[in-house]
Design a protein with these regions (language model features):
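Charged, glycine-rich intrinsically disordered N-terminal tails and low-complexity linkers that flank
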Residues: 1-68
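Immediate flanking context of iron-sulfur cluster ligation sites
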Residues: 13, 160-182
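Local cysteine-cluster metal-coordination motifs and their immediate loop/turn environment
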Residues: 23-26, 179-192
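Short cysteine/histidine-rich metal-coordination sites, predominantly Zn2+-binding motifs
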Residues: 38-42, 197-211
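Active-site helix-to-loop segments that bind/position phosphate- or nucleotide-bearing substrates
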Residues: 46, 63-67, 209-247, 254-256, ...
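Mg2+/Mn2+-dependent nuclease catalytic core
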Residues: 57-161
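A surface-exposed, charged beta-strand/loop segment in the N-terminal or early-internal portion
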Residues: 80, 267, 273-348
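Metal-dependent nuclease catalytic cores in nucleic-acid-processing enzymes
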Residues: 107-133, 290-294, 430-438, 472-477
Length: 561
């Protein structure tokens, strides 16, 4: 990227960064260059505490923080005094596991390198240090590490490699079929198997391009390196006049009539406030400190904004995003995949649920999807999307199993919606836009700068880009389900000459239906494993980041079969 020269490596590299690099250069880059943090079981569950502390060990240690400008390393070091006086010391690490039985000495290279780097820091500051100590709490054994010349040379070379990686701002390639990935909690961020598969394909969209072709549509069975769904869930506050307060480690939501409910903050992924709902400052600050976003909507469901503590530290991704957005050709290449995927998913929804659909409609949608994938301009792509949308919405009403004319659907309308179906569609599109906004922000993107939707004041263009392929799969599917299952009826809506509004109780039903859909596990059409739709959004966002960074050639839209 053109701005790379303006981003310099840190003057001092943490010694723990060297152990991360020794274990997996890609994990090191994700953690230190992109600012993503997740405790890695394989690298650190059998390793030292996150800060290298040995406070809970029986060793007589004192902890100091030293830097070595000449070496270019800084570290928090646990010191054990040797027999040679106060300047004769040993660096020490506390491990939660036990010595490795499969290797000589019982200590893996990442920890040997970290200890050696600490010793070099000590030596530059006038200490004597020829060996280190690792205490394994599970087995209560202490293992000595000698700082011989080969280890010192390996450590110095690794310092140079880490500095070069930080200066180049290029993510190292993922490991291939490595056992290290199996228990690494960076798996959902790194996506090693997914990236390796896509890099093997000449065309990142080719496997997803086949609508009926069983060969092209065949998925690969990849390792499940990411959780299938989140343990944390969104919390929605819809009742007007409600207040949200902090109560210990919980949030208390109190309605206007005095009824109160609590939810543990550890279980919350995001807090969504609709209309006239107030939140106290202590509650807001606590959520900010926990990096839990607070999202504000109008009473009608229009997404207004977000309150969040610190956003992603991945400035490299945002710089590359702005570079891509300025390049119309590269932006168009992304937009083609997104819109083509959207049209294919529209076709799938109709094919599955409209049993009387003319074959001509499916053929035309397939043609439009192909044309979108090869569009030569934004104007042409907009035209193709518009024609496909008109055809799709002309058949969407056929999916509704109701004889009530007031619940019929004859086409898309909005601002204000003039029938209940369109009212629910608009409401769900607002929730889905919020979901994409939060996901993109967490990955490190700027949600207001898109590639297909052009920048406009207050419009989350990239969130709208990402949600295109999920409109039929999530929002439209939920609408059909809610009306066909009689969860929503005419009495749930306020129908006037000016438009249609959703009643308060109906909004709860809509949100519940949306959350059921987002929590549904689906087999990924390309990678073969089962994950929830909410997790799919994150995977797609991270794949988009891999395209922006140059790791994979094309964006693989999520298309079901």
């Amino acid at each position: 990227m053109a701005e790379e020269d303006h981003i310099s490596a840190p003057d001092l590299i943490p010694a723990s960064m060297l152990s991360d690099y020794s274990y997996c250069p890609r994990q090191c880059y994700i953690r230190w260059n992109e600012g993503e943090f997740a405790e890695c079981e394989d690298a650190s569950a059998n390793a030292s505490d996150a800060d290298g502390s040995a406070a809970s060990s029986p060793l007589a240690c004192k902890t100091i923080h030293l830097s070595a400008p000449k070496l270019g390393v800084t570290s928090r070091i646990n010191l054990i005094e040797g027999d040679g006086g106060a300047r004769d010391v040993m660096p020490a690490l506390l491990k939660r596991g036990e010595p490795a039985a499969s290797i000589a000495g019982g200590v893996y290279d990442p920890d040997r390198v970290r200890l050696c780097a600490q010793a070099l820091v000590l030596q530059e500051n006038g200490f004597l240090s020829s060996c280190g100590l690792i205490y394994f709490s599970k087995s209560r054994k202490a293992v000595s590490v000698q700082f011989d010349e080969p280890l010192i040379q390996m450590t110095r070379e690794m310092i140079s490699q880490v500095r070069a990686m930080a200066e180049q701002r290029r993510m190292p390639p993922p490991l291939v079929d490595s056992h290290k990935c199996n228990h690494c909690t960076f798996g959902g961020i790194c996506l090693p198997d997914e990236v390796n598969l896509l890099r093997q394909l000449k065309d990142g969209n080719s496997i997803l391009a086949g609508i009926e072709d069983p060969v092209q549509g065949e998925s690969r069975e990849l390792r499940m390196l990411l959780p299938s769904r989140d343990d944390q869930v969104p919390v929605y506050v819809l009742d007007q006049g409600s207040t949200v307060h902090k109560k210990g480690d919980c949030l208390e939501v109190r309605s206007r009539d005095g009824k109160a409910g609590t939810v543990r903050m550890i279980d919350i992924s995001q807090l969504c406030l609709y209309g006239g709902v107030e939140i106290s400052t202590p509650a807001l600050v606590e959520l900010m400190q926990r990096s839990i976003p607070v999202l504000h909507f109008t009473h009608g469901g229009w997404f207004e904004g977000i309150c969040l503590g610190h956003t992603s530290k991945n400035i490299d991704l945002r710089i590359r995003q702005f570079d891509w957005a300025r390049d119309r050709n590269r932006s168009l290449s992304l937009a083609r995949g997104m819109i083509s995927g959207k049209i294919r998913n529209c076709r799938v929804l109709l094919r599955r649920n409209d049993h009387q659909i003319p074959g001509e409609v499916l053929e035309r949608l397939a043609e439009y999807a192909g044309q979108a994938g090869g569009a030569e301009s934004f104007e042409g792509l907009l035209g193709i999307e518009g024609v496909a949308a008109q055809l799709y919405f002309s058949r969407l009403g056929s999916l509704l199993k109701t004889d009530d004319l007031e619940l019929s659907f004859k086409g898309r309308n909005r601002r204000p919606p003039r029938d209940p179906v369109n009212a629910v569609l608009s409401y769900l599109y607002g929730i889905l836009a919020k979901e994409c906004f939060v996901t993109l922000l967490a990955v490190g993107f700027e949600p207001y700068l898109g590639f297909y939707h052009q920048p406009r004041y207050g419009r989350p263009a990239l969130a709208l880009d990402l949600m295109e392929e999920f409109r039929p799969l999530v929002a439209d599917s939920v609408v059909v389900s809610l009306f066909n299952n009689r969860e929503l009826e005419v009495k749930d809506f306020v129908i006037t000459d000016e438009g249609v509004m959703i009643g308060s109780s109906a909004k709860r039903k809509v949100v519940a239906g949306y959350e059921r859909r987002m929590d549904t596990k689906i087999t990924h059409p390309l990678f073969g494993y089962k994950i929830s739709y909410r997790r799919v959004l994150e995977v797609q966002s991270r794949l988009l980041a891999r395209v922006i960074s140059g790791e994979i050639e094309r964006y693989p839209a999520f298309c079901t079969r």
